[in-house]
Regions:
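Conserved beta-strand position repeated across blades of beta-propeller domains
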Residues: 63, 73, 106, 113-115, ...
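Surface loop/turn motifs at the tips and blade-to-blade linkers of beta-strand repeat domains
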Residues: 61-66, 103-109, 146-155, 204-208, ...
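Conserved beta-propeller blade signature
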Residues: 79-83, 120-123, 170-174, 223-227, ...
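A short loop-to-beta-strand structural motif that recurs across blades of beta-propeller domains
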Residues: 89-92, 128-130, 191-193, 242, ...
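Beta-propeller domain segments
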Residues: 11-54, 160, 177-180, 195-200, ...
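Beta-rich catalytic cores
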Residues: 58, 68, 86, 101, ...
Length: 387
């Protein structure tokens, strides 16, 4: 047998997760995930006059110099904590009333997010779970490492997590699908889980959830509502991102069914959508529906109370952009009769398909104003209302 050629080619590297499911006729497509801007934009350089809101509302840059800002958790004593994704940082912002200062709590983590409860900051990344006890008063406190108790899967794709404590005092943690479209290698993916704060008592609440990165609890029913990203490479207009109510034990379709009624052409299954939980609302194809907050404050007019607000970061897998805004989902408490309406727009220009901002997460302040993080510009806006 002859020797192998020294020039024999090594096997081709597998396609990145976001390219999975790309049809052959789109192999030369220039569509690709949008890289984040990892430097901060100063408040004076943010074109805030382009942002549009309903009459009576105003917006200001509440904090800048927080590159990659995503989820926001409110601590005690005027402290706020902000997670990021590629930068691997967690920021602490101190609100001094008229000014804000920021510092890095921890960095060099893999896609960290934040939650806060009973004086402790919880930080979860792809491979770590850390708890900072009493951090508001002791900024240099060493974290307690809870990683071993949470059984974190290692895959990075769709494994940035939004986390939050529910009305039951338990910590809710999603685990996204490790691909654009695939049969997951194990059942630990495409789930929403619930834990006790120390990592014990893990329960799987929902399966077939491709990638939820935002949820909140209805103020009246106490049911969790969550956003979910649809798959890519099925065209500009399919499938939709979706908004759902959590049914414990429910299956939400991935990988064989999307938006509750659309069988997948690649991962085929007989009667693929039978028994799948249906969405409350369709949030637009590839819109990147992110943070979710029910408004319960008294600052906004009464017609906004108990309305669901949703930040849509903006599409990449679409020739015509969609998203780059904050919308409202007005629906009955049981999820029926949902209507999606614009609230905060102006981050993009439909005429030339340009955009300058990517709203990502929302947080209601104690006074009823709403914070909106802009991952692209590394700033946090404050939206308020006055007659």
């Amino acid at each position: 047998m002859g020797a192998l050629s020294a020039h024999a080619q090594a096997p081709a590297a597998p396609a990145p997760a976001w390219k999975q499911g790309m049809p052959a006729n789109m192999a030369t497509s220039t569509l690709a995930p949008l890289p984040g801007k990892l430097t901060a934009t100063k408040a004076a350089d943010v074109p805030i006059n382009r942002i549009k809101l309903p009459p009576g509302f105003k917006v200001e840059v509440w904090a800048d110099s927080v590159p990659g800002s995503r989820a926001i958790a409110q601590g005690d004593g005027g402290k706020y904590y902000v997670g990021t994704r590629p930068l691997g940082r967690v920021y602490e912002i101190t609100d001094n009333g008229t000014t804000r200062t920021s510092r890095v709590v921890i960095d060099k983590l893999d896609q960290p997010t934040v939650a806060y409860r009973d004086g402790a900051l919880f930080v979860i990344s792809v491979d770590k779970v850390l708890r900072f006890d009493g951090i508001d008063k002791n900024p240099t406190v060493a974290p307690v490492d809870l990683t071993a108790k949470f059984n974190l899967p290692p895959e990075k794709h769709h494994n940035w997590k939004y986390i939050a404590f529910g009305p039951d005092g338990k910590l809710y943690v999603p685990f996204g699908a490790p691909c654009n479209i695939c049969e997951a290698p194990s059942e630990e993916y495409a789930q929403i889980r619930r834990y006790n704060a120390d990592g014990s008592g893990m329960e799987v609440l929902a399966r077939g959830v491709r990638n939820t990165v935002g949820f909140d609890w209805h103020p009246v029913t106490k049911e969790m509502w969550f956003s979910n990203h649809g798959r890519d490479w099925l065209g500009d207009d399919t499938p939709n991102d979706t908004m759902h109510r959590l049914k414990v034990g429910g299956h939400y379709g991935f990988p064989s069914c999307h938006q509750g009624n659309m069988p997948d052409p690649d991962v085929k299954k007989a009667k693929a959508c039978d028994g799948v939980e249906q969405p409350v609302a369709l949030m637009g194809p590839h819109s990147a529906t992110m943070g979710v907050t029910f408004y319960t404050g008294n600052m906004f007019p009464a017609e906004y109370r108990n309305v669901l607000f949703n930040a849509r970061k903006g599409s990449w897998n679409r020739t015509k952009k969609i998203g780059h805004d904050v919308v409202m989902v007005r629906a009955d408490a049981d999820g029926k009769n949902a209507k999606v309406e614009p609230f905060m727009t102006g981050f993009s220009n439909e005429a030339d398909q340009s955009w300058w901002g990517r709203p990502a997460y929302l947080h209601q302040m104690n006074d009823g104003a709403m914070l909106v993080s802009d991952e692209q510009n590394g700033v946090i806006y404050r939206v308020s209302y006055s007659k």
